[in-house]
């Protein structure tokens, strides 16, 4: 069966055909690091981790780029507010602190490190190059009020609105800079001229004066830098469809780039039946979530619904996940104990059942895939009851394969070693970062550097295993 994904732009399921045979380029909008990460950030990271794992299992080499928006209005505003109350933390330090929180939470959930994780501030020249092209093509203009702002001219691009199937006339004005300098209220900022109350460190030189990039141009530039002018999948939360992704598509296409071939969006998170929001005071931080249960249960809970659905987090969510995981772990414990010393030990083929593959190929239907997983656990237990060790071994192999694909295998070294100590969590973060650096080296065929990282980890007692589902590590016994 061919993998099918719901493409937001097409408004329909489409067969997934990579631009290059055997390879997938995927860009995912990462966090804007103006505050601590919350449950919505983790849900999004987990969704694209599941997609990446399935593509990898299917034999595709995935290049995943997930950006970090480390400069924008909110980052600067939050840093300024903290300084007004007597703090001394600079905006870039605040952004880095929250970036580290997001990374640590992602590692705790078993989210594999992106191939590339660029910060917006490291791609300023690439952003300016796209802006210059847009000006030359007549799709952008510098504000005439001396502010240093540069805007995208929405009226110059008739296709504007194609992602969300809206007409420009039906859209409201963008509220991202002084509207008096715009030709049209719906025009959006590509470059924001420096303001008097903003720090020197947040201003970058440009042909239009010192300033900083608008939010939308950041992702267009970073995706192009790491994946090229055309790539396979652009992902992000449902709340980013408009205006962020609509603006990304318009400015990249107007600059002459084909951009993303598939647009994939994950659903949002409700808390106790209500939309999560600051005004309701019901936001659940990553720290709160990971403190409420072991990370494996959090991963199972957030990843058990269909990625496009809105999930509802409530008091019983994590206990339901724990119960499901106990059934899986209980089967592994029982079958391994019974098969020990028999000719069936290790005989089960670690291949997912056809029904599981069909579910995952059907727009990543994880709920149906989990149903297959739990049915296989039940049949495996029934085989043990009947002393059918061959069938039990086969079921074990299938359960192992399915839980590996979903990242919820309780036998995985990560989950066996997920403890409550800060030292263990710090070790996991450090090892994952080194593995990320190793993957980057391999991407550019710098095998000397990649081997050196592996040797350093081995010397520290860390075993590295490269598998079809990704790189796994464990501490040598």
Swiss-Prot record:
Binds 1 zinc ion per subunit. It catalyses: tRNA(Cys) + L-cysteine + ATP = L-cysteinyl-tRNA(Cys) + AMP + diphosphate. A motif ('HIGH' region) lies at residues 31-41. It is found in: Cytoplasm. Keywords: Aminoacyl-tRNA synthetase, ATP-binding, Cytoplasm, Ligase, Metal-binding, Nucleotide-binding, Protein biosynthesis, Zinc. A motif ('KMSKS' region) lies at residues 275-279. It is an enzyme of class 6 (ligase). Its main location: cytoplasm. The keyword Aminoacyl-tRNA synthetase applies. Signal peptide: none annotated. The keyword Ligase applies. Pfam families: CysS_C, DALR_2, tRNA-synt_1e. Zn(2+) binds at residues 29, 219, 244, 248. Its EC number is 6.1.1.16. ATP binds at residue 278. Its cofactor is Zn(2+). PANTHER family: CYSTEINE--TRNA LIGASE (PTHR10890:SF30), CYSTEINYL-TRNA SYNTHETASE (PTHR10890). This is Cysteine--tRNA ligase. The lineage of its organism: Bacteria, Bacillati, Actinomycetota, Actinomycetes, Micrococcales. The gene is cysS.
């Amino acid at each position: 069966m061919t993998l099918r994904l719901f493409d937001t732009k097409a408004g329909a399921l489409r067969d997934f055909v990579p631009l290059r045979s055997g390879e997938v380029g995927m860009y995912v909008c990462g966090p804007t690091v103006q505050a601590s990460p919350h449950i919505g950030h983790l849900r999004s990271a987990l969704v694209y981790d599941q997609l990446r794992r399935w593509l990898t299992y299917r034999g595709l080499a995935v290049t995943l780029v997930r950006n970090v928006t480390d400069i924008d209005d909110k980052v600067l505003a939050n840093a300024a507010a903290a300084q007004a109350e007597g703090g001394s933390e600079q905006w870039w330090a605040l952004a880095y602190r929250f970036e580290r929180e997001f990374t640590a939470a992602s590692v705790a959930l078993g989210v594999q490190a992106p191939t590339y994780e660029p910060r917006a501030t490291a791609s300023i020249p690439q952003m300016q190059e796209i802006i210059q092209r847009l000006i030359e093509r007549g799709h952008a203009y510098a504000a005439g009020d001396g502010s240093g702002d540069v805007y995208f001219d929405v009226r110059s691009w008739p296709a504007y609105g194609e992602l969300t199937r809206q007409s420009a006339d039906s859209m409201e004005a963008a509220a991202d800079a002084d509207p008096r300098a715009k030709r049209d209220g719906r025009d959006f900022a590509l470059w924001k001229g420096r303001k008097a109350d903003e720090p020197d460190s947040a201003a970058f030189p440009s042909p239009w004066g010192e300033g900083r990039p608008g939010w939308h141009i950041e992702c267009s530039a970073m995706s192009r830098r790491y994946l090229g002018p055309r790539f396979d999948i652009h992902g992000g939360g449902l709340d980013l469809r408009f205006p962020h992704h609509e603006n990304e598509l318009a400015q990249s296409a107007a600059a002459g780039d084909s951009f993303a071939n598939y647009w994939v969006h994950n659903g949002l998170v409700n808390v106790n039946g209500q939309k999560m929001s600051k005004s309701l005071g019901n936001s659940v931080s990553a720290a709160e979530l990971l403190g409420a249960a072991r990370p494996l249960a959090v991963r199972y809970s957030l990843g058990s619904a269909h990625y496009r659905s809105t999930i509802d987090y409530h008091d019983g969510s994590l206990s339901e996940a724990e119960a499901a995981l106990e059934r899986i772990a209980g089967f592994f414990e029982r079958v391994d104990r019974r098969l020990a010393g028999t000719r069936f030990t290790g005989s089960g083929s670690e291949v997912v059942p056809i029904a599981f593959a069909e579910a995952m190929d059907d727009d990543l239907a994880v709920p149906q895939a989990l149903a297959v997983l739990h049915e296989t656990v039940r049949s495996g237990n029934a085989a043990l009851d009947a002393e059918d060790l061959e069938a039990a071994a086969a079921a074990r192999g299938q359960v192992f394969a399915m839980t590996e694909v979903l990242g919820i295998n309780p036998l995985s070294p990560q989950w066996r070693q997920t403890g409550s100590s800060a030292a263990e969590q710090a070790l996991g973060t450090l090892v994952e970062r080194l593995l990320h650096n190793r993957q980057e080296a391999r991407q550019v065929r710098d095998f000397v550097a990649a081997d050196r990282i592996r040797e350093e980890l081995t010397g520290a007692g860390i075993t590295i295993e490269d598998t079809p589902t990704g790189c796994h590590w464990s501490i040598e016994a």
